[in-house]
From Swiss-Prot:
Residues 1-70, 87-155 form the DRBM domain. It comes from Arabidopsis thaliana. This is Double-stranded RNA-binding protein 3. The keyword DNA-binding does not apply. Residues 328-338 have a biased composition (Pro residues). Residues 266-280 have a biased composition (Basic and acidic residues). Binds double-stranded RNA. Gene3D superfamilies: 3.30.160.20. Disruption phenotype: No visible phenotype. InterPro entries: AtDRB-like_DSRM_1 (IPR044450), AtDRB-like_DSRM_2 (IPR044451), dsRBD_dom (IPR014720). Keywords: Repeat, RNA-binding. One of its GO terms (molecular function) is double-stranded RNA binding.
Length: 359
């Protein structure tokens, strides 16, 4: 844990990474370790011996972090890490914006030889300038200037004592608010009044919404109970049917249409049939008329309509006995069965010849 913090601090401060050296003492079955760390040219040793090498390195890193934190303006370890990572630049900018002032302006000056430059930075805020410690990089010089400005503003006379980091930011914002222009000071009470009015309105709306919500829930519950009781006791709703006068008028129209359709179907059937005497008359209505009737009534009554593919009645079929030409005529029956079975054939001379038929 301490090794990671020390390494992160070195990376963000643009320093070389810390290097560890360890010494071992004691027998092989019970060794003891003591470590030292080199951080930016300074060496820090662990105060006591440890049973493992890792513990010795962590103790050396802890000593280094505590020593570095005591050198800075803040005394805690976490505050020192924040100082080196540039958090105070963000805090200074945020508090200046909150106080209604212009953002801080940093001016850095480079000095020293080209291969080993040094930078010194000054920050201007609310008509005041603050100088920071010189550093090897421009970024670090700006961080140092922000730290110097922050702690100098915090040391200005105040009414209440310091109570943690959150209270510290409020104190700096209050100090900076003294240097605001008069126009911004006049706008502040109006804004505070608007904020208080908005808060009261929101509170009232929340209370009214809660009360109205409770009333609505109670009403909905009562309505649900009433509807359940009514649905269990009341009969089912009646369907809407058209009046009788409309039904009679529509029925008369449908009948006239059916008669016309039937006449048209009879005329068409008479034209299609080859022989009118073979027409088959039935008392049942034609399929066309039935389909028309159903389609007409379907507009009035709520029953589904069915469409069927009806076909016409086939004409009557006459069966005739056909005799082929090539076949011999049928034998005629003999009127005299007692006569002799002879066949007479006339010859060309006028004489007749008789032949007996075979039995």
């Amino acid at each position: 844990m301490y090794k990671n913090q020390l390494q992160e601090l070195a990376q963000r401060s643009c320093f070389s990474l810390p290097s560890y050296t360890c010494t071992r003492e004691g027998p092989d079955h019970a060794p003891r370790f003591k470590a030292s760390v080199n951080f930016n040219g300074e060496i820090f040793e662990s105060p006591t011996y440890c049973s493992t090498l890792r513990q010795a390195e962590h103790s050396a890193a802890e000593v280094a972090l505590s020593a570095l934190s005591s050198k800075g303006p803040s005394k805690s370890l976490t505050a020192r890490v924040l100082d080196e990572t540039g958090i105070y630049k963000n805090l200074l900018q945020e508090t200046a914006h909150r106080a209604g002032l212009d953002l801080p302006v940093y001016t850095s000056v480079r000095s020293g030889p080209g291969h080993i430059p040094t930078f010194s930075c000054t920050v201007e805020l609310a008509g005041m300038s603050f100088n920071g410690e010189s550093a090897k990089t421009k970024k670090q010089a700006e961080k140092n200037a922000a730290i110097a400005a922050w702690f100098s503003l915090r040391k200005m006379p105040r009414l209440d004592p310091l109570r943690g980091e959150e209270k510290e930011q409020e104190i700096v914002a209050r100090v900076l608010s003294r240097f605001r222009p008069k126009e911004v000071k006049r706008r502040e009470p109006n804004q505070s009044r608007r904020r208080t009015v908005i808060r009261t309105i929101r509170q009232n709306t929340t209370t009214t919404t809660t009360t109205t919500g409770d009333l609505l829930c109670e009403k909905l519950r009562s309505i649900n109970l009433y509807t359940n009781e009514a649905s269990s006791s009341s009969p089912p709703p009646q369907r809407f049917w058209p009046s009788r006068t409309n039904l009679t008028q529509e029925q008369s129209k449908v009948k006239s249409l059916l008669e016309k359709c039937q006449e048209y179907a009879e005329k068409k059937q008479s034209l299609d049939d080859p022989k009118p005497e073979m027409r088959i008359k039935t008392s049942s209505p034609s399929p066309l008329s039935s389909s028309v009737e159903r389609n007409c009534y379907s507009k009035l009554l709520p029953f589904p309509s069915f469409v069927l593919n009806h076909q016409k009645l086939a004409p009557a079929v006459h069966i005739r006995s056909v005799i082929p030409v090539c076949s011999a005529p049928p034998p005629k029956p003999n009127p005299n069965p007692n006569s002799s079975p002879f066949i007479t054939r006339e010859l060309g001379n006028g004489s007749q010849e008789k032949k007996s038929l075979p039995n």
